[in-house]
Amino acid sequence: TLKFLMKERFWFKMISLKKEDEQSHTISIKVSNESGVLARVIGLFSGRGYNIESLNVAEIDEDSHKSRITIVTNGSIMTINQIKLQLERLIPVDTVDDLTTDGPSIEREMALIKVECNGNNREEVIRLSETYRAKIVDTSKNSFVFELTGAIDKINSFIEMMRPLGLVDISRTGLAAISRGKKE
């Protein structure tokens, strides 16, 4: 039983260390824009139990039929490297980059945020939107819809500020990201 207890302590310690080493990573995947590619990429994540926190997909070159898939996931460096290797083996995948570790990158998200307001808090809602540079894209007697683009922390902060003022609904694009500077 002593050996068993020592093994249990070892695995518990390994699991604890693994959780501490996990961090958020932004993975950029350039793929051929063809039917079923996204399903294969998502299948790789779900089949191995990797969680996707954010997903953004768009065509980036109409002539060469290329799209970029941007995925935010959590994991240790070892786990992220394993994900990258598995993604690179998929046939329609051209390149896989971990924008978190491969150098500086720019990351932005866009959100549409609907807030119901009355005469009492209408001024406060407008003042906060100006502070965050949120654009009013729709307005009615009792509500506003704001468009806000920026870092995830900025969007989360704006949402939390609007929550007590009458937040009704949110739609977010998922993270869009690109590496900075010249690609080596």
Ranges and model annotations:
Residues 10-67, 72-184:
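Long, contiguous binding/interaction regions
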